[in-house]
Amino acid sequence: MLKSYQEINAETIDRWIEEGWEWGQPISHETYLNAKNGNWNVLLTPVNPVPHEWFGNLKDKKILGLASGGGQQMPIFVALGANCTVLDYSDKQLEAEKMVAEREKYEIEIIKADMTKKLPFADNSFDIIFHPVSNSYIEKVEPVFKECYRILKKGGILLCGLDIGTNYTVDEKEEKIINSLPFNPLVNEEQRKQLEEQDCGIQFSHTISEQIGGQLKAGFRLTDIYDDTNGFGRLHELNIASFVATRAIKE
């Protein structure tokens, strides 16, 4: 039986983590203690930290980390007094969450699930959903935003990190434009070969219309946005944005 692209991506990310992938390295005990003392930052996108005012007071808030495993953000939110749930499809990312929780002696609900399916939560379950860059690993993003709207409480906040597609147009050195958009290896054999050669799993470009428009169509009101770069490489050096972070509210 052929593996789904979601399974291929989970296995790819597990392998990257074993090789030292930066987004799979859990925070240190010192970083956790600093957060408890009010000194903290978290990332939705590679470089620019999320403004603290996007969150408000996190004490006793119910937060879902959506495709947010790795032991990087959830421990910070716990340190700030939140009740956290993390959902991811990578075993290694979830193992990191469990490791930090055991080390720091706190409770967190850890769920392995595919976010392209109906999310395993009741309506109106969460105050905040924290969704860092990850939807580039799924083909259709609009259903995810609809599910986020369903499971957020009225007045709840959706925080997203979004790849806006620039990365999928250029070669590895980021010197030449080699691809048209959309980038979809499920329908474009040449794009699939590119990903295979670079061990990049199965990735997809998504437009602003899909991602921000998708949030608006789901019922959200956009309240703030900022852009960001890759953090390295030629596009970064030229200050060409590859990501946006968004804050939206369920009214």
Where are these regions (language model features)?
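Conserved alpha-helix/loop element of class I SAM-dependent methyltransferases that forms part
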Residues: 27-61
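Class I SAM-dependent methyltransferase SAM/SAH-binding core
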Residues: 61-118
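A short acidic, Gly/Pro-enriched loop at the edge of an enzyme's catalytic core
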Residues: 116-128
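A short SAM/SAH-binding and catalytic strip from SAM-dependent methyltransferases
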Residues: 127-142
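A short glycine-rich, Lys/Arg-flanked "PGG" loop and its adjoining helix->strand segment in the class I
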Residues: 142-157
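Conserved class I S-adenosyl-L-methionine
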Residues: 157-190
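Short alpha-helix
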Residues: 202-225
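Core SAM-dependent methyltransferase catalytic element
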Residues: 218-220, 234-251
